[in-house]
Amino acid sequence: MSQPELLLFDTMARELRPFNSIRANKVGLYACGPTVYDYAHAGNLRTYLFVDVLRRTLEINGYEVNHVMNITDVGHLVSDADTGEDKMEKGARKQNKSAWEIAQFFEQAFFDDLKLLNISTPSVTCRATEHIQEQIKFIQELETKGFTYQTSDGVYFNTDRLADYGKLARLDKQGLEAGIRVEMAEKKHPTDFALWKFSGDKPRQMEWQGPWGIGFPGWHIECSAMAEKYLGDVFDIHVGGEDHIPVHHTNEIAQCQAKNGHVQANYWLHGYFLQLKKEKISKSGTSLRLDALVAKGYEPMAYRYLTLTSHYRSHLSFTWEGLSGAQKALHRLRNKVAFLPSNGNVDESYRELFMRHINRDLNMPQALALVWDVLNSELLPENKRATALFFDRILGLDIHKIETVEIPEHISRLVELRTQVKRQGNFKKADAIRNQIHDLGYQVNDSGDGSTVTIRS
């Protein structure tokens, strides 16, 4: 059967576009990573789940993916308008630790979360603090080409030099100029942004000697410099959250156009927010951190399941009822798959339908629904399992695994009693014991290897 064409929604073009890689069977993918001054929350993690699904989809289509992700451990100011203090310095003061300790701690916490959510590790992880010279060199080239100017607090990019600045976000640059109501200090235009910020009179924990003075790089320059180092000055796909469109990605594009004469990525993909009561979730609260969900009795993979029920370009409203429903559905799915026989074959008609769903801009709600269709179909049991596990290469739910739980002693005794009466041929009594176990909140699963017990969903 023919492979359906892979279509991706390109934010720059505002349309679905057939995906064609620069090099045959290889993809360069750059993902904006976390600013490691605090724990990631569920909204942050939704973006990385979307990136994981994208990577898995590319791989199942036969591509070798070079997935590069940055770690912002310096330079991201509290305000995207280049004002306020560095988030790392602020986090260090809050935790009474050094900025370096904060970065190391929260970077590890972030990767722990990725592991719990079964998110693939990037091919390359690059920290901003380990690429200062690359960023300085990038700024110097912009300076040589006349795209920068210096103020008393730093070196800025002159957005007026680019005729199509803001194309990605459809920014009304003239409207911004006319409607500006905030203090611009020495900036020439409201859209100009910092490339290098001076430390000033107060020494910082993170600062470097640059050609313009002691300071630190701006937030946007790190991604342009590191993407070019690891993927070249033009690569296939750049991804991030929808909040990156109007400022961060717009400014990345400006830097690369100014330096190289072209946009750095052929496709721009953006995941939409997770919302709580129709508002964007921020890092200010702790209730939607992954460890908080676990403390409430939810397993991390239930959150992964929940995100698959909504398209990545749709806002997902978070509710505890929704997460509970996702956990129950995940348990039912595992129980259905775990006790199906092995050594089956993937059904080709279902495979083609699944590929059609995922290849049309990662339509995971339809792909997830198809798993249930397969399990409720008339396929041979072993082929149901093989087909569902093929789907799980994209879903990433590890549906062949059943969580190990401690079974209470009185339940274990009932299971043992049921096994004995079955051996004696008293199947009516065995069924009665099964029902008793069911009423107590557990499920007996019989197979050729004996019986196992799981918590009833």
Curated annotation (Swiss-Prot):
Ligand binding (ATP): K283
Cofactor details (free text): Binds 1 zinc ion per subunit.
Catalyzed reactions per annotation: tRNA(Cys) + L-cysteine + ATP = L-cysteinyl-tRNA(Cys) + AMP + diphosphate
Highest taxon above the source species: Bacteria
EC number(s) reported in the record: 6.1.1.16
Catalytic class of the enzyme: ligase
InterPro entries: Cys-tRNA-ligase, Cys-tRNA/MSH_ligase, Rossmann-like_a/b/a_fold, tRNA-synt_1_cat_dom, tRNAsynth_Ia_anticodon-bd
Broad class of the protein's primary localization: cytoplasm
GO cellular component, one term: cytosol
Database matches in Pfam families: tRNA-synt_1e
GO BP of this protein: cysteinyl-tRNA aminoacylation
GO MF annotations, alphabetized: ATP binding; cysteine-tRNA ligase activity; zinc ion binding
Family per similarity comment: Belongs to the class-I aminoacyl-tRNA synthetase family.
Subunit record text: Monomer.
PANTHER family linked: CYSTEINE--TRNA LIGASE, CYTOPLASMIC, CYSTEINYL-TRNA SYNTHETASE
Entry-linked HAMAP family: Cys_tRNA_synth
The protein's name: Putative cysteine--tRNA ligase 2
Gene it is expressed from: cysS2
